[in-house]
Design a protein with these regions (language model features):
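An acidic/histidine-cluster motif and surrounding catalytic segment
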Residues: 1-90, 94-253
């Protein structure tokens, strides 16, 4: 199973961060040169926004979000043209646990019904199947029955990558919404699973503050109404809401 890391040309520190981790685990990876949304022309930005237009729920796309979306589509296209049945995709600001090495070296742990298996946690509540479908090392694999945030670490089936690469990005939010939000045009058709505990977490969500490397974000923070729309639905659910909705947080391994 090949491993891919999405990385901007100007983000050398992030690439070094990923290389240190994977070198220690004996994992090789292929770098995907990320699309820099801030370098796209007005025509290119308009073209994407037109393709992504969702009349019912308009979304105020930022150039950096467009770049991230196009970068994942580039990764999907690369996977679709390869020979591996499954491939792993990471953004370049994640921390990975030692347990992930075994998973990346052998795909036999992946259930044949899985389209996508999420490696990461954002510490947000998720609704999972009551019982795991399988075991992956020290981690359990659960079917996901809710929306999920984050697309910084996942395994994807080649046929699904091909389908997503050729699908128009018609969505009302960033790439993780496209993949995992229940109202997405593609998410309801996907069989998504989650590892618990999660062997991957973005730097900004690392539960140990001292372990964060302050890699920052390539997504500029919106202001005003746009900020409310983008962040309001992403707030961490309170314990009471989690219990009422059957959701639970996924710890980082």
């Amino acid at each position: 199973m090949r491993t891919y890391v999405i990385n901007l040309d100007r983000a050398a520190e992030r690439l070094a961060h990923m290389r240190r981790q994977f070198d220690q685990l004996g994992i090789s990876f292929v770098r995907i040169a990320a699309v820099d949304g801030t370098s796209l022309s007005d025509r290119e930005l308009l073209s994407f926004r037109t393709l992504a237009e969702n009349g019912e729920r308009p979304y105020q796309w930022m150039p950096s979000e467009i770049g991230i979306f196009l970068s994942h589509k580039l990764a999907w296209s690369t996977i679709a043209s390869g020979d591996d049945q499954y491939a792993a995709v990471f953004e370049d600001d994640v921390h990975v646990s030692d347990e992930i090495a075994t998973l990346l070296k052998d795909s036999s742990w992946i259930h044949n019904s899985a389209d996508i298996v999420r490696f990461e946690t954002t510490l947000q509540g998720m609704k999972l199947a009551r019982k795991p479908i399988s075991q992956a090392g020290q981690m359990k694999v659960f079917r996901v029955y809710s929306g999920a945030w984050g697309a910084a670490g996942y395994v994807i089936k080649r046929e699904v990558a091909s389908w997503l690469a050729s699908s128009p990005p018609r969505t009302f939010g960033p790439v993780d919404w496209f993949l995992f939000h229940p109202e997405s045009v593609v998410a309801p058709a996907l069989s998504v699973f989650q590892l618990d505990p999660a062997p991957c977490v973005q730097d900004q969500y690392h539960p140990d503050v001292d372990s964060r490397r302050n890699l920052g974000s390539h997504v500029l923070t919106p202001t005003g109404i746009a900020q409310a729309l983008k962040t309001g639905s992403r707030r961490l659910l309170s314990p009471m809401v989690r219990k009422a909705t059957g959701r639970r947080g996924i710890p980082y391994a």
